[in-house]
Structure formats: C-alpha cells, structure tokens
C-alpha cells in the first residue's frame, strides 16, 4: 500500500486503496473492503472435515485400516485399495478375509459368509444337544436308556446299549423258558440253532431249530433233500441244475434244432404254431402233402420224373439244371446260349433298335468293363478305348472280309504269272488283321489308248516325259503317253445315241462296289 493505515486511516474508513499485485486476489480487487469480502468462509472459519454430505478435508488411512474396512472418516488411495483387493473375501475355493460368526449365526447354521470359532462351535453344539432331540422322523441327540427303562420296555425316547439289550433278553428268556429244559414237540424249552450240515443230515429232532439262513442254504441236490427254487423259463431253457421245473416251464421248453425239449405232434407238414422247430411229424403225417400251399425248406431231390399236372410252377430263386425238356423243348442253359451266340459275335441287324441290352451297334464308342466283363476280357482294346472302357468296332459303310491270307489265296493256281506272263488273280491279295480297316482300291489293269505323237495337248492328260515307245518301237522314242478319261460321258445325253455313249447308265461313281444293301452290324457285349 502507498498510504500509512496505522496513522492516517480512521476506524470508520470503508474504502482504502488496495494493490492486488503479487497477491492471489484478482486485479479488479482494488480496496481493502473488497479484498476482505473476497475471502471465502473457509479462509475465515477454516476447512471443515469431509463427510458424505459436506466437502472438506480428511485423512488417508493406513493399509491395515483399509484391510479392516471399519473406518468411515478416511479416504482410500489407489495404493491402499490395491492392497485391500489383494485380500479377497474367503470362500470355499479362495483363500481370503473372513469375519467371525455371532452366537445367533452359529446356532442358526445358515450363514455361509462368516467363520466360526471354537467358542461359537461350542455354543451351537450345546444348543443342538438341548433342542435337537432324535425322533422316528428326524435325526438328533438321544440319551441312553437306564436299566429300569430298558426292562420296562415302555420308554420311546432313549437308546438301548448292548448291555441293556442283553439284560432285557435275559429277562424275556426267563419269562418264556423259566427252566433250562430242552424244547420238544410237546414241551417248551431252550433250543440250539442247527448248522447246514446238521439240517442236511436230518437226524436231530429235539432241542434244535432252523434259522432262515440255514433254511435258505439247505439247498436240494441229487445227494441231499432240501429247499429248491422254481425255475424261470430262461433258467429251465439254459439247463440250470439248481431249480425245479413246473408244468408251465416244461411246456414252455419247446424243442429246437439246438435244444432238446417237448414237441407237439402234427400230421401236416409245413409251418405250425410256434414254428416248425416246436412240432414233430407224426407217423401218419403228409411228408409231402397234396393239398397245396406247402413250403419245403432246404433241398428237394427228385430221382425220377417230376410232373406238374395242372397249373404251373412259380420259381423265384435259382434253378440249377444240367439238362432236360419242357413240353418237348430242350432246356438251354446260359452257357449254351453263349456258345451259340458268344459275347463278341457280330451279326447283321435289319432294324435301328437293338434286340436287347446284351447288344451294341458297331458304330464305335465304348462299353463299361464292369458292365460287360466278358467283352472286356475277350475283345479288350482292339477297337480303342481303355481296359476300363473297351472300344466297339465302327463298321458303318464297310464290307467284311476274312482276316489274313487263306488257302484260296495261297493256292499255286492263283499265284505267279499265267502263260502270257501276267500276274494271276491271287498275287498281292490278303485280308488284314482282325479289326483292321483297308481303304478302297482298284487292281492294276490296262486300257487301250489312242496313239499320239510328240505332243503336250492330250484331252484327258498325258505324261510330262516324252520318251515313250511309239508304233515303231525302238525307232520311235519321242512320244508322250496319253490318259483316257474317268469313264464319264463326254457328250450330253440329248446328243448321244448308242454309238456315242461309253457306258451303261449309273455305272460310273466314286466307289468300285458290287450290288449291295445296307444293314446295321451289331455286336454282343454281354450274356
């Protein structure tokens, strides 16, 4: 301040100049009264203690105070909170903090979040002994019977010890058998329990009794008399030697092919009630009855003639026959059919559809070896394909000739040259291997041609060279050799007569062939 408040400011002064420089007051505070008014109540009265409803100051607790968790006036820091969280509440599976149960909690026995001390356990145990009494319907504590109570036999709230039980038994035995005389069939007395061996011996009579244990173990055998159990049907069927057979279980043990048993006689062959295995044929049974509807299981062997007078025979299985006749016609087997028309045979077929699935058109392609195994083994890949899918021959547009060169072609009479030095008709002629296709050809032959001198203007062509022999042979070597035409007519039909016509109608074409008719070739691929 720039003035002397001690000597010059009166007690009544309200506004004295104030400089806020280097203070925490804002710059607009410029007099003392404003500065005093700006001081907060905490600056005048001090900062209050913090609570759940009042802002203020508070202490930071120690780690132990945080772990105890009972102080409500101090603030937890992150560090002490982390320490507390490292000690979780104890459970049945986690180690941690716990509190002690009160007496009421120990007695109630329902709290599962607090531990019980030995003192609290004693309180709970004493309470159980005082309040939890054993009855016929609930577990609990019970007192030992006194001797008078045991002998009186009237108390229903105490327990008997072995000693008290023995003392009561002595009393009761004395009442029942006042003397130690042996019991007989006519007099009361004491008895001794017989052993199993004594019961089986069967000689003891007076003074002995049979207990349930001895009775149940004195089983009947082939050597000893005794008790025996009636067997179930399953036990009787399994040949159990320790049970007795009743009329019902005897009747229920029907005879089978694997088990002896009772049987019922029948005069009718075939299925009976209970199955064929439970019935037996009587002496007068129809082994093969003539009433119809019979089923014969197994093999039927007929040594002589089998005659069906009326109707027919419906056979759904396999009939294995080595020969015979049906209505005068011989029975043919599958093997005989294959020998007649074997797989791989080719025949002409006058239709565009196959006779059966056993045949294929000879139009190329393949078949499946798994579907046609005999074809695959016999023909193989001769006509293409592969072992899994062998090929079919393609015979469309082809004639067939014998394979190889036979005796007709190797005969000397058709081989070599004739008396004029010309090759005979068998020279060079041969068939191919099976499945080989030969292209069309024309045998070598000659034509008489017109003569021409040294000229390059032949109407149907001529050779390029001109050193061919002419009419004067050795003296004429400068001639060309002229070609004839292909056999086609030269003049139009309208201008020709018999003199100017070369050939018969429709004789000339692209092929050299005889008269023919086209049919389908088919091949057998399976039986």
From Swiss-Prot:
Q: Record's Gene Ontology CC terms?
A: virus tail, baseplate; virus tail, fiber
Question: Which InterPro entries does the record associate with it?
Answer: Phage_T4_Gp12 (IPR015173), Phage_tail_collar_dom (IPR011083), Phage_tail_collar_dom_sf (IPR037053), Short_tail_fibre_C (IPR027448), Short_tail_fibre_C_sf (IPR044916)
Q: Which UniProt keywords apply?
A: Host-virus interaction, Late protein, Viral attachment to host cell, Viral attachment to host entry receptor, Viral tail fiber protein, Viral tail protein, Virion, Virus entry into host cell
- Primary site of residence: virion
At the top level, the lineage of the source is Viruses
Q: Which GO terms describe its biological process?
A: entry receptor-mediated virion attachment to host cell; symbiont entry into host cell
UniProt keyword annotation of Transit peptide present: no
Q: Where in the cell is it found?
A: Virion
Question: Which GO molecular function entries does the Swiss-Prot or TrEMBL record give?
Answer: metal ion binding
Give the protein's biological function: Structural component of the short tail fiber. Adhesion protein that binds irreversibly to the lipopolysaccharides component (LPS) on the cell surface of Escherichia coli B strains during virus attachment. After at least three long tail fibers have bound, short tail fibers extend and bind irreversibly to the core region of the host cell LPS.
Record note on quaternary structure? Homotrimer.
Q: What is this protein called?
A: Short tail fiber protein gp12
This chain's source organism reads: Enterobacteria phage T4
Give the gene symbol.
12
């Amino acid at each position: 301040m720039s003035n002397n408040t001690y000597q010059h400011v009166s007690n009544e002064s309200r506004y004295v100049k104030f400089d806020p420089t280097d203070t925490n007051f804002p710059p607009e505070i410029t007099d003392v009264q404003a500065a005093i008014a700006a001081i907060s109540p905490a600056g005048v009265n001090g900062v209050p203690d913090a609570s759940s409803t009042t802002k203020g100051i508070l202490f930071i607790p120690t780690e132990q105070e945080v772990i105890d968790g009972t102080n409500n006036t101090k603030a937890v820091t992150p560090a002490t909170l982390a320490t507390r969280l490292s000690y979780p509440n104890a459970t049945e599976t986690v180690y941690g903090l716990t509190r002690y149960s009160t007496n009421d909690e120990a007695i109630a026995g329902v709290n599962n979040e607090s531990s019980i001390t030995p003192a609290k356990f004693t309180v709970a145990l004493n309470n159980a002994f005082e309040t939890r009494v054993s009855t016929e319907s609930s577990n609990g504590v019970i007192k030992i019977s006194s001797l008078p109570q045991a002998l009186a036999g009237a108390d229903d709230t105490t327990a008997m010890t072995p000693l008290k039980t023995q003392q009561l038994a002595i009393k009761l035995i004395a009442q029942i058998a006042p003397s130690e005389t042996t019991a007989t069939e006519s007099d009361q007395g004491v008895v001794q329990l017989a052993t199993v061996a004594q019961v089986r011996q069967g000689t003891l009579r007076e003074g002995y009794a049979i207990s349930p244990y001895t009775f149940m173990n004195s089983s009947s055998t082939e050597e000893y008399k005794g008790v025996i159990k009636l067997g179930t049907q399953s036990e009787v069927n399994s040949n159990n030697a320790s049970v007795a057979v009743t009329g019902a279980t005897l009747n229920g043990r029907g005879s089978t092919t694997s088990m002896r048993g009772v049987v019922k006689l029948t005069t009718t062959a075939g299925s009976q009630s209970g199955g064929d295995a439970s019935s037996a044929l009587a002496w007068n049974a129809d082994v093969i009855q003539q009433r119809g509807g019979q089923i014969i299981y197994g093999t039927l062997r007929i040594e002589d003639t089998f005659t069906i007078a009326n109707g027919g025979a419906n056979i759904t299985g396999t009939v294995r026959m080595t020969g015979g006749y049906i209505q005068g016609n011989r029975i043919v087997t599958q093997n005989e059919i294959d020998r007649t028309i074997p797989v791989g045979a080719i025949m002409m077929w006058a239709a565009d559809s196959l006779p059966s699935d056993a045949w294929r058109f000879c139009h190329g392609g393949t078949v499946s070896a798994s579907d046609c195994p005999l074809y695959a083994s016999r023909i193989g890949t001769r006509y293409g394909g592969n072992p899994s899918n062998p090929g079919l021959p393609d015979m469309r547009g082809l004639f067939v000739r014998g394979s190889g060169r036979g005796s007709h072609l190797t005969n000397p009479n058709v081989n070599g040259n004739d008396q004029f030095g010309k090759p005979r008709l068998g020279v060079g002629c041969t068939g191919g291997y099976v499945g080989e296709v030969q292209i069309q050809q024309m045998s070598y032959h000659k034509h008489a041609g017109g003569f021409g001198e040294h000229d390059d203007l032949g109407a149907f062509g001529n050779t390029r060279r001109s050193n061919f022999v002419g009419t004067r042979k050795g003296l004429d070597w400068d001639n060309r050799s002229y070609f004839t035409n292909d056999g086609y007519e030269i003049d139009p039909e309208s201008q020709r007569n018999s003199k100017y016509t070369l050939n018969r109608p429709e004789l000339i074409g692209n092929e050299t062939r005889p008269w023919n008719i086209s049919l389908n070739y088919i091949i057998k691929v399976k039986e």
